[in-house]
Amino acid sequence: MKNYLLFEIGVEEMPSRFVGSTLEQLKNNLSKLFDENRIAFDKINAYGTPRRLTLVVEGLSDRQNDLEEEIKGPAKKIAVDAENNLTKPALGFIKSKGLSESDIYFKQVGKEEYIFATIKQDGKETSEVLKDILPETIKSVVFPKAMRWGGKNLKFARPIRWIVALLNDKVLEFDLEGIISSNVTKGHRFLGESTIEVDSIEDYFEKLEKNYIVLDQNKRKEMIRKQCIEVANSLGGEVEFDEDLLEEVTYLVEYPTAFYGEFDVDYIKLPKEVVITPMKQHQRYFPVLKEGKLLPNFIAVRNGDSYRIDNVKAGNEKVLEARLADALFFYREDTKRNLESYIEKLKTVVFQVKLGTIYDKTLRLEKLSADILDSLGLVDEKTDTIRAAKLSKADLVTGMVGEFDELQGFMGKEYAKVGGENDVVSEAIFEHYLPRFAGDILPKTNAGVALSIADKLDSIAGFFAIGIQPTGSQDPYALRRQALGILSILMDRKVAVDIKVLIEHALDNYSELDFDKEEVVEQIMNFFNERVKNLFKDLGIRYDVVDAVLSSDINDVSDMHMRALELNNWLEKDELVEMLTAFNRVSTLAQKAESDKIDESLLKEDAEIKLYNEFKQVKIKVNELLKDKKYGIALDEFASLRPVVDNLFDTVMVMDNDEAIKNNRLALLKQVYDTMLEICDLSKIVYK
């Protein structure tokens, strides 16, 4: 019989940022516990609000699958004495497993015989096992911040106030540190009943709906979206949706009601982002636009119905008014001075104790961004880029950014414009923070590209130079994100630049620090290569393809990407296994070579002479193709050597007894291998 399970954890209001990830953990952890306990099921659905986390399991089996497991005991030589009697180790094994002597047998494993026994265990009723599994599911959830309450040892994001556990229509009663599971849930805190008894899963959903709970977060999100659109339409505008904000608001409410508020039209004169930032970041409101311009309205979502919505509206308007009044004040005060006048104050802001102040960082950015422009061949942009570097951090000490730090970079751009800086300088000040997160926009101007790379690389180089590197899940200075930002920019621009050279330039700006430059360069290169692996994996490129490309000692990420894509496609060719097998043998033997110097007079066999002659022609063609970045065709050309390589291995003993002949053949294979490495290392490709 197929059964269903209803499992609800009732909590005090959880932070919205925790709800989605907690549901995912609960779902995954319960699924894992089902597998470990041999309980079959069809699927698990997860639903959540700020006050409840619910799992609905469909297709549960009646009982565990029976267990039959072969277990291994001590070796026969210590399990049986000279008289063929069982020894203490053997008897101890039998006793510990609840066996009798007749249950054991001996099996050969390698060169030894061992005691074995087959344990059979009948499966328990699912209802019995669930009473252990469900508490464990709750305990297994991990939070960035958790709390204890009421003298309990249990830790959770917020105190657990009730638990519902139903298998079909039967209550699964268990005690989780004084919290007794039942069939009693609660409705909306203000609109619903405080005690709701449920008899089945259908009854549960029906009663929650009657008590103002929209349990399904996807349904709740679409309700919010639809309501916001309707409200915006009534204002003659369009709502500007931010999907992250929409997700957050979804997990802030159990029963959403959207409404609009108004603010003084004078605030519209402020830069758009200055108005939108406190709306979204601080108040969780959605802005309303008409033809791309802000209207003096916002849309908020209430956790409840429309009762006395005017009071709620007035309260929200009052809070936003205070925020916008602060923003207007800071804007007026900040623009009384030009942006350059704030630079001096950067000398008082510490970047990192050993790496100096933010002012020191801007000096390094002026040098490094100029070096990057040289590497990119964009020297005409140098004057504007250096100017942007000088001003890049000045907005950090303005009143506006002090109050709304999300506006860093943007306010620098705005204040630069107000102060008369040209568009290139102004835009670069904003763009140097890009990308700020995964999927963010990338800098478009040359000055912005150079300054963005410089800013991120300066941080990475500095922290590595003083021995601070990301470890495990710890990355307090977001160095991984900054490295991915650099790689994303370089791939987007498709520019040929040696990242190792840029790293060396960045480290040159830290000459006052005591570190081994060669060692730190290697550490940073390894760090970037790990990021390349992650980035390419996200782009759907096989891990072994990435390893093959990285083994070619290429430091140009745009070029790496092109090679990886070409190799990914090339691996679809016929006779792939035969090709890879041949060149794997080349790789293995080539690494035994002491030199790549070939003495033609020592080439005696027809097969090695033919390989040598064909290889010379192929090498010339491959080098020409590499210059034109035709990597797929270069691979085809190199792979054309396979027949003569196979012939060599079939007819010639490479490891000849004559040392000179052996070394000469190894040198030939090394040259073949080195040419392969000019494209990629095919020996890294995994095949069946």
Curated annotation (Swiss-Prot):
PROSITE patterns assigned: AA_TRNA_LIGASE_II_GLYAB
What keywords are assigned to this protein? Aminoacyl-tRNA synthetase, ATP-binding, Cytoplasm, Ligase, Nucleotide-binding, Protein biosynthesis
Catalyzed reactions: tRNA(Gly) + glycine + ATP = glycyl-tRNA(Gly) + AMP + diphosphate
Q: Name one GO biological process term.
A: arginyl-tRNA aminoacylation
The enzyme class is: ligase
* GO annotation, cellular component aspect: cytosol
The EC designation for this entry is 6.1.1.14
User: What is the superkingdom listed in this entry's lineage?
Assistant: Bacteria
Molecular function as annotated in GO: arginine-tRNA ligase activity; ATP binding; glycine-tRNA ligase activity
Enumerate the subcellular locations listed in this protein's record, separating them with semicolons. Cytoplasm
Q: Which HAMAP family match?
A: Gly_tRNA_synth_beta
Q: Which family does it belong to?
A: Belongs to the class-II aminoacyl-tRNA synthetase family.
Q: How does it assemble?
A: Tetramer of two alpha and two beta subunits.
Name of the molecule in the record: Glycine--tRNA ligase beta subunit
